[in-house]
Amino acid sequence: MSNQLQALRDITTVVADTGDIEAIKKYQPVDATTNPSLLLKAAEMEQYRSHLENAVAWAKEQSDDADQQIIDAGDKLAVTIGTDIVNIVPGRISTEVDARLSFDTQASIEKAHKLIALYKEAGIDKSRILIKLASTWEGIKAAEHLEKEGINCNLTLLFSFAQAQACAEAGAYLISPFVGRILDWYKAKTGKTEYAASEDPGVQSVTKIYNYYKEHGYKTVVMGASFRNIGEITELAGCDRLTISPGLLEELSNSDAPLEVKLKDTGATTTPGKPLDEAAFRWEMNQDAMATEKLSEGIRNFAADQVKLETLLKSYV
């Protein structure tokens, strides 16, 4: 009898949400995703010490400016860990643009170009890479530009339908709507501590986005992310992709409960309407307190972990 993880793999592309090489080897996902928080966690592990030393040594060769050396070392470390991962998984690695650039379209494009160039130097083609960008208006516009260059993007920190609509209209390759962080917000605001999986507001958000994309014929891949429990995951069985932490992958592999397909692509039935412009996007975000707060919080937290990572790298200079 197959376990839930095996059953899920039959209907959904399973992605590992980790920078831990050993976990990736164990669970054998198709793709893997990283972010500044996961990179910091990996960088603090003893087995990655040589990666940090090598990244700093490389950065010193690129510039005499101390601040630039740390930025370069951070980029090199992200790509080095990403290269390790992409040599294990058959699919793609998602590598994130510095969250501090979330409101700067041009700087985000330039950082993406730098990451792609570093991967190329490591022998990894851009077809194996997804550039992660926060789903701000500026991040979405950066993705629109990069997609036209043939650089595929993963739009992350996505909490609202407006963000999802704008990403699809921009031609983004993939979005990462966050499930658990939406649930966190509702729990904090309502005081309600238990939600059935089908009533989970994060699950409902991803379900709405998935159905909208399929009904309107959008090709953008929906990859549910940020899960708090396996109930959220099983309720989204059938989603294009789900990126799951090692702890929840383990829970799924230890469960033999039956798995039912919840999301199905029944084909395009509706023509897309008028696209969102910047004013409409910002208004829709303003009207969604949860999305506004969680996007801002997510950017702050990723930026803070990037600073912690850079502080760690400074100790190697």
Swiss-Prot record:
Pfam families (alphabetical): TAL_FSA
EC number of this enzyme: 2.2.1.2
Keywords carried by this UniProt record: Cytoplasm, Pentose shunt, Schiff base, Transferase
Compartments where located: Cytoplasm
Active site annotation, chain numbering: K132 (schiff-base intermediate with substrate)
Phosphoprotein among keywords: no
Enzyme class at the top of the EC tree: transferase
Assembly behavior: Homodimer.
NCBIfam families: PRK12346.1, talAB
Protein name: Transaldolase
